[in-house]
From Swiss-Prot:
The lineage of its organism: Eukaryota, Metazoa, Ecdysozoa, Nematoda, Chromadorea. Residues 584-705 form the PH domain. This is Anillin-like protein 3. It comes from Caenorhabditis elegans. InterPro entries: AHD, Cytokinesis/Rho-signaling, PH-like_dom_sf, PH_Anillin, PH_domain. Signal peptide: none annotated. Pfam families: Anillin, PH. GO terms for biological process: actomyosin contractile ring assembly; mitotic cytokinesis; septin ring organization. GO terms for cellular component: actomyosin contractile ring. Coiled coil: none annotated. Gene3D superfamilies: Pleckstrin-homology domain (PH domain)/Phosphotyrosine-binding domain (PTB).
């Protein structure tokens, strides 16, 4: 007699000849009983004879049953690509049911372990149990559905289908279009779905996620190569904020070779002085009044043939031709200088108004003066930078050709809405302002304050102005800056009886016309100049860069450099004029760019360093990424080449392979990253093959013709 837990006792046997029998298990019952099972009350203590007989009957039944098949070990996900040996579906059914039953703790098992005296006996029908085989192993017969049990018996006799990791493949020689086969195929789909769900649940539980591998949001699948990047594509929603290209893309400074540098500095006489800092290439002669002698003399073998288009710069006059570019630059500079004088005058008036508002303790007048002072100072800053840039451009010998006026665009921005932090409650203490800048144009919205008496449950602020920018280039960028300041609180003095009597006495003793008889010591203009310049109290709390691609209705964007109380997003409406279809064409491919040598040893040996990039020609600019996947996933390009700043009349293949690469061509650009310094650089590129070279040259030259037509 085997030992068993004292808390569980065997059931009482039924009379001989009954149609039902009891089954007792030494291990806890963890399965779901059938619907026709009935329960018996706990057996009282003291009936030792009946307990011994019942135990002998149950132990004899367990010895006749075969042991359950061993559970196969589930392989880890690392070996998932290795195909397991083919096995029949019927052999997997008891394993899956056993694994599922081991993880599930039934209420009967809980009741068994909680210390109830006696055994809960489950009664099964003896007719079905004696006639049907035990498909589920040591588990009750009613735990397996009827369809799956019959299908497993049929699959043991004849194998019609073969299941693998990908799906269910049908053997063509054993399958015919009959009603029985169709029914079997439907039942097989049900079986495969049950087995697949059980395997997926086990794989998910056994999988261990690595924190480092999940930081970049990349997911590797067994059917995808490891070197291919797969990003989780989220569905685009108009309410979801977007990121914009915050800084303007620049031409790589390390690419190519410098040709000429132009720097602008102020001379001793007070006027601007243009100086050429570096000239690495001899200038090409423009014209001369005296041609070369002996032009018709036959050349010698040692001398190169004469170039009839070459000539020397004439020493008679300083200008060999009319320089329209210099004339236009002077006109623009004169207009800017006049605008600078007006801006400085407006700054003086705004400072004087601000001082008066602070003395009179008028908050609304102080906010208006602060707004005008901020706008004028920002406008003066960009105007001075533009003047320095134009002064440096006047000495450029071959400036870029002018752009067609049809490519000038107009953009209107309206309904700017800022979102507040959810913890922001002091609405009456701040005033907000939005400032927009593009080259020398500076526009701003009105000052909006959130007064305490107008508190609403909405946690955003709306600017209803329409701001318009015109005469914009193809690759324009508009900078948006959000400013805030604390609203000055000027509380009126308390009117006590003593203060009221003192004011009455002062009015009686001092005559009303005493202020008119006071002598004026200085003029208002001199007082404005002598007064100290007050500081602007508006503080930058967020910025954003807008371009042509950011136009649309109800667009949401993330802000940069956000501080409290802003939440970090902005919603606005923007509309921009469309470009002609000819400039909107796209051309893609790989290009190699020559970079400068970083180490002194490589510079001494003149070892060329080529880098391969994925390139896109679109809207008059060539954008560069490291791989094509970066463009697909809308990552920010590494740099760009702006063809509007190209000084070449046309792009052609280089005749000499100076850097040891085939299919070369170069583009000369004017780079003005610093307003006081303009550099002319030659960017050397190379294509993959001759066909790619011809395609790139054709696409770039067509773009230049469209821009300059």
């Amino acid at each position: 007699m085997e030992n068993f837990d004292g808390k569980s006792m065997p059931p009482t046997p039924v009379p001989i000849g009954s149609s039902q029998f009891y089954r007792w298990m030494p291990h806890p019952i963890v399965d779901t009983p059938p619907s026709d099972a009935t329960w018996r009350k706990p057996v009282p203590r003291g009936r030792i004879r009946d307990l011994v007989a019942a135990f002998d009957q149950c132990s004899g039944m367990l010895e006749q049953k075969p042991p359950p098949p061993p559970t196969q070990r589930v392989e880890s996900l690392e070996n998932e690509h290795i195909a397991p040996p083919p096995t029949s579906k019927s052999s997997k059914i008891p394993e899956i049911l056993a694994k599922k039953s081991e993880k599930y703790i039934s209420p009967y098992e809980k009741r068994h372990f909680h210390g109830r005296r006696g055994t809960q006996a489950v009664v099964f029908n003896s007719n079905n149990a004696q006639n049907a085989p035990n498909v589920g192993g040591a588990y009750p017969y009613g735990a397996t559905p009827l369809k799956l049990r019959n299908l497993a018996q049929k699959m043991d006799k004849e194998e019609l289908y073969v299941a693998d990791d990908v799906g269910i493949s049908k053997k063509s020689e054993n399958f015919e279009n009959s009603d029985d086969d169709v029914a079997n195929f439907q039942e097989l789909l049900v079986l495969d779905e049950v087995l697949e769900n059980a395997e997926n649940s086990e794989n998910l539980e056994s999988q261990q996620y690595d924190e480092e591998s999940t930081l970049n949001r990349t997911f590797q699948d067994s059917g995808v190569p490891e070197n291919q990047e797969n990003l989780l594509q989220l569905p685009e929603c108009p309410k979801t904020p977007k990121f914009t290209s915050s800084p303007t893309l620049f031409t790589p400074y390390a690419a190519g070779e410098p040709i000429v540098e132009y720097r602008c500095s102020s001379g001793s006489a007070g006027g601007p002085l243009k100086i050429v800092v570096k000239k690495l290439q001899a200038p090409i002669a423009l014209a001369t009044s005296t041609p070369k002698p002996a032009m018709c003399r036959p050349p010698k073998h040692s001398e190169p043939p004469p170039a009839f288009q070459d000539s020397f710069v004439s020493s008679i006059s300083n200008w060999s031709a009319v320089d329209h570019h210099a004339t236009d630059s002077r006109r623009q500079m004169n207009r800017l200088l006049n605008s600078i004088d007006e801006t400085r005058h407006h700054i003086l008036l705004a400072e004087h108004s601000l001082l008066e508002a602070q003395k009179s303790k008028c908050p609304m007048q102080e906010l208006a003066s602060q707004r005008v002072l901020l706008i004028c100072r920002e406008r003066l800053k960009v105007q001075l930078e533009e003047v320095r840039r134009l002064q440096a451009m006047t000495v450029v010998r071959h400036p870029p050709p002018p752009i067609n006026r049809h490519f000038k665009s107009t953009m209107v921005i309206s309904n700017i809405s800022l979102q507040f932090n959810k913890h922001f409650h002091s609405r009456g203490s701040y005033a907000f302002l939005v400032l927009l800048k593009c080259r020398t144009e500076v526009e701003a919205t009105g000052v909006v304050t959130l007064l305490a008496q107008f508190q609403t449950p909405q946690n955003f602020i709306l600017f209803g102005e329409h701001l318009r920018f015109s005469n914009l280039p193809v690759d324009f960028t508009i900078g948006m800056e959000i400013y805030m300041m604390r609203v000055p609180e000027h509380r009126p003095p308390e009117k006590t009886c003593a203060a009221f009597l003192a004011q009455k006495v002062r009015n009686l003793l001092v005559p009303s016309n005493a202020a008119h008889r006071r002598p004026t010591t200085s003029t208002p203009q001199k007082s404005i100049q002598n007064a100290t310049s007050p500081a602007c109290d508006f503080q930058l709390c967020g910025n954003l860069t807008l371009d042509r691609d950011s136009s649309g209705d109800n667009r949401r964007f993330y802000l940069d450099d956000v501080i409290y109380p802003l939440e970090g997003t902005v919603k606005l409406n923007s509309h921009c004029t469309s470009l002609p279809d000819a400039i909107d064409m796209e051309y893609r491919g790989f290009l190699h760019i020559l970079h400068d040598s970083a180490s002194p040893l490589e510079r001494a040996k003149k070892v060329p360093i080529w880098h391969k990039y994925w390139s896109l020609l679109h809207r008059g600019a060539i954008l560069f990424w490291s791989t094509p996947q970066e463009e697909v996933h809308e990552k920010v390009p590494i740099f760009q080449i702006d063809l509007t700043k190209c000084t070449n009349n046309s792009i052609e293949e280089s005749r000499e392979m100076s850097q040891g690469a085939e299919h070369e061509f170069h583009i000369e650009l004017l780079i003005d990253q610093d307003p006081d310094l303009i550099e002319k650089r030659r960017v050397i590129l190379a294509a993959e093959s001759s066909d790619h070279l011809n395609s790139w040259l054709s696409a770039i030259n067509d773009t230049l013709d469209i821009l300059r037509s």
